[in-house]
């Protein structure tokens, strides 16, 4: 059984009705992520993902999930494996206040995001916090520190940010569509380069 991405009741409640297309690192990037998250949680107790993930898109389409799944499956058929490379521990500043593991903009990662943007053009699927390919920061959220006071956030931000000399990397050959419904997380694994016969 796969580890869920979110587990706390408060997180599950806040995500109700939403869907996320994500990548799940499982090797080198996962290892450095877990070490960084453990270190961050040692400095403060804060909401955080239960499992590392790279979000490619967020949606709010609880009544059109099958339509959304069909579009993503079609996108995945033409998708090649994606190289993810961790390059730094960084932050999203206030008002978000999130410590992140920032990823390099590898050609395969940028292409996957851009191709998804193209697939979504002309649809009225509701996207959340969508950015252009140029403006999107590829990342894994480590902890969510939105409730920290400004001084405490400034200190955490300064202590967290650093470049990674080792540049851990791995290749991911599938995506997951994750959705939140009735207080629970659900997901479907979608391999790249394979046509589903559903």
Predicted regions and their residues:
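Basic, often amphipathic N-terminal segments
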Residues: 1-85, 106-166, 184-198
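Pocket-edge structural micro-motifs
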Residues: 58, 102, 179
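A short small-residue
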Residues: 53, 95-97
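Glycine-rich beta-strand-turn "strand-cap" elements at beta-sheet edges
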Residues: 89-95, 170-186, 194
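Hydrophobic beta-strand residues in large extracellular and virion-surface proteins
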Residues: 21, 101, 175-177
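A broad, low-specificity signal marking well-ordered, structured residues that form hydrophobic/aromatic
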Residues: 82-84, 98-99, 138, 170, ...
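Short histidine-centered catalytic/ligand-binding loop motif
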Residues: 99-105
């Amino acid at each position: 059984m796969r580890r869920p991405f979110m587990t706390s009741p408060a997180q599950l409640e806040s995500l109700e009705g939403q869907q996320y297309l994500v990548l799940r690192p499982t090797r080198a990037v996962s290892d450095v992520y877990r070490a960084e998250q453990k270190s961050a949680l040692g400095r403060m107790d804060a909401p955080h993902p239960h499992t590392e993930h790279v979000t490619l898109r967020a949606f709010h389409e609880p009544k059109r999930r099958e339509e959304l799944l069909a579009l993503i499956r079609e996108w995945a058929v033409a998708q090649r494996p994606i190289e993810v490379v961790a390059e730094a521990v960084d932050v999203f500043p206030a008002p978000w206040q999130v410590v992140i593991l920032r990823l390099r903009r590898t050609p395969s990662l940028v292409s996957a995001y851009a191709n998804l943007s193209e697939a979504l053009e002309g649809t009225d699927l509701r996207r959340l916090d969508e950015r252009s390919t140029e403006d999107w920061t590829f990342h894994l959220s480590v902890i969510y520190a939105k409730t920290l006071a400004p001084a405490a956030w400034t200190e955490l931000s300064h202590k967290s940010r650093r470049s990674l000399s080792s540049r851990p990397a791995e290749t991911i050959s599938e995506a997951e569509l994750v959705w939140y419904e009735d207080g629970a997380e659900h997901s479907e694994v979608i391999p790249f380069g394979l046509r589903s016969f559903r």
